[in-house]
């Protein structure tokens, strides 16, 4: 949804906003193969409500466009939120969730529970990782000079004017299997304090950057 409002003969206000869900509506039955043994397994993956990654599902923008005597200025403030990371299906396999619960019982000071009643998984156990959103301000200033033949145009564009480098642009969850081992009897051993599942890989916005452009029209 967007709108453009003419404030004066030389100044316009622009707004834009969108919200999306883009999520799975059910769990799935998965078939996968372990590369180290080439064995094929079947399991249930609890991926319901997992959302599309790599793009903000909530966006908003407000901007001012000014045009006076050959000058133009565009100032835009853009808001991004609900940025989900690419989820790991294997982290949500029923067998893995069961092993994670066993790891919690064996080492409750390290691993969180995946079920409280033995009937359903906790929200945190299957929650999708998210990235930090926020505001980004962009500025463009230009001047057009008419010549006898054609015109000369100057344009300075600055992206991320406020140097906000906390906005996540994407990333992915990391597998949790290296946090512990499970022997043939189902006993959890060799726990590790560092959990990859709690430390997803994230990518962040570039800092302030810009470009100066000169063009000639004829």
Description of each model-found segment:
Residues 34-45, 112-123, 189-195:
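Flexible, solvent-exposed coil segments and beta strand-coil junctions
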Residues 4-6, 10, 65-69, 142-146, ...:
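Structural signature of outer-membrane beta-barrel channels/translocons
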Residues 45-50, 124-128, 197-202:
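Extracellular loop and loop/strand-boundary signature of outer-membrane beta-barrel proteins
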Residues 78-108, 113-117, 132, 143-218:
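C-terminal beta-signal and adjacent terminal beta-strands/loops
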Residues 1-89:
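Gram-negative outer-membrane beta-barrel transporters
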Residues 51-57, 130-134, 203-207:
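Transmembrane beta-barrel outer-membrane domains
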Residues 1, 58-62, 135-141, 208-214:
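Hydrophobic, lipid-facing positions within transmembrane beta-strands of outer-membrane proteins
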């Amino acid at each position: 949804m967007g709108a453009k409002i003419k404030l004066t003969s030389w100044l316009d206000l622009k707004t834009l906003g969108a919200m999306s869900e883009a999520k799975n509506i059910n769990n799935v039955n998965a078939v996968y193969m372990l590369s180290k043994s080439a064995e094929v397994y079947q399991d249930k993956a609890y991926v319901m409500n997992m959302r599309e990654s790599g793009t903000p599902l909530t966006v908003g923008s407000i901007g001012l466009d000014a045009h006076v005597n050959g000058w133009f200025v565009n100032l835009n403030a853009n808001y991004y939120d609900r940025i989900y990371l690419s989820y790991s299906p294997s982290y949500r396999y029923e067998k893995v969730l069961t092993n994670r619960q066993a790891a919690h019982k064996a080492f409750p000071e390290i691993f969180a529970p995946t079920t409280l009643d033995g009937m359903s998984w906790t929200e945190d156990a299957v929650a999708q990782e998210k990235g930090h959103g926020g505001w980004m301000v962009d500025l463009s200033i230009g001047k057009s000079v008419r010549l006898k033949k054609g015109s000369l145009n100057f344009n300075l564009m600055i992206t991320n004017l406020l140097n906000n480098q906390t906005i996540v642009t994407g990333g992915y969850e990391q597998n949790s299997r290296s946090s512990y081992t499970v022997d043939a009897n189902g006993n959890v051993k060799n726990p590790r304090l560092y959990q990859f599942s709690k430390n997803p890989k994230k990518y962040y916005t570039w800092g302030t950057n810009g470009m100066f452009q000169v063009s000639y029209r004829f």
